[in-house]
Amino acid sequence: IDHVTGTLAAVLLVLISIGIFAAPLVLSIFAPGWLVDDRPEFDLSAGMLRITFPYIMLISLTALAGGILNTFERFLVPALTPVLLNVSLIAAALLLSQHLEVPVTALAWGVLAAGLAQLILQVPALIRLGLMPRPRWGWKHSGVRRIMKQMIPTLFGSSVAQVNLLFDSIIATFLVTGSVSWLYYSDRLLEFPLGVLGIALATVILPNLSQKHAKANTHEFSATLDWALRLAVIITVPAAVGLAILAGPILITLFQYDAFQPDDVRMSTYSLIAYSAGLPAFIAVKVLAPGYYARQDTTTPVKIAIAAMVSNMLLNILFVGLLLIQGFEGPHAGLALASSAAAYLNAILLYRGLRKRQVYSPEPGWTRLWVAVSLACTTMGALLLFMTHDTESWLQASAIFRIRNLSLTIVFGVIVYIFIGMVAGLKTHHLLRGAK
């Protein structure tokens, strides 16, 4: 642990130093549209990039600490860690932005603060285990070398999502000014349920699946995956419906202050709705991929991720092109929609692979589950739409009114969903038993 921590920190420190110095060059590669049009966003983004570059080292060390904790079955802290980024960004947007000369730079400082908070959160748990690293250089250490060889396939597979995001950003820089920001705000709101549920589920089931595979217990391996998928459906489908319907009120409540105008809310709403459609698929990928990793199969998820990446790139061009031809005011939403479609392709291919290898077989009751979830979501969605159809009143309301009404609306929606779901036959106690 000491050698891995020290080597990782040293390598990242060098990369970060280069990144801070060469920020304009990096930005010209990943946001060429701003450079070609000589937009003012270029210099601003270069400055924000310099602020956020240290986050790479902070989150990498946080991930290493989280891996240590997961190994010793300490899941709570790593599962809660991603939430801090969303909380920090929201706090920076609401509290810090109004005190800065350029309000949007508050988000960059929010990212940096989140990195520090995420890393600090791991420390008490590591100390309690007696595993607080004492960084040491160990490039030639056998353990470091072994980890480097094992992590390359997983690292490549994980980077596919980032490549998709970069490709989206490149295209967005050629669209109307504000497209990158609208996608970013939408993505941040999508990352909240992904961080809370997706990463938490993946974190919990991976060691569980690994144990089942080591014991050659195929039935329990399949049952664990089935439980995780059912839980994902029960939570993510209503979350997707709620996020899409409440996109406007959520964006207004969190961001519609000062420079963030009603037009920004409308444009961000388009992309948030498109992202929301893919939420169940994004979570499903995080649940299904551990089914391969637990069996030491890191190659198949990488191949599938590459296929999804290529499809995402092609769909980006297709969807954005179609929206531009139709004269739609928010062609950037095509980028979000392409990401959602690619996520479904990823999830379907992962699912088919597990079925083909006969390591996963759905348990009875899926039809009843889908019927119950569909009825509950339809009822909840209709009521939420009725309660929030007047967006204009939200725009004119005070911050306190917005927060109060949004909170009450969400609570009401959750209650309606649970009630209708239980009436329709949703058995949540079966899911709780499946977690054991």
Segments predicted by a language model, with ranges:
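Membrane-embedded alpha-helical bundles of multi-pass transporters/translocases
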Residues: 1-436
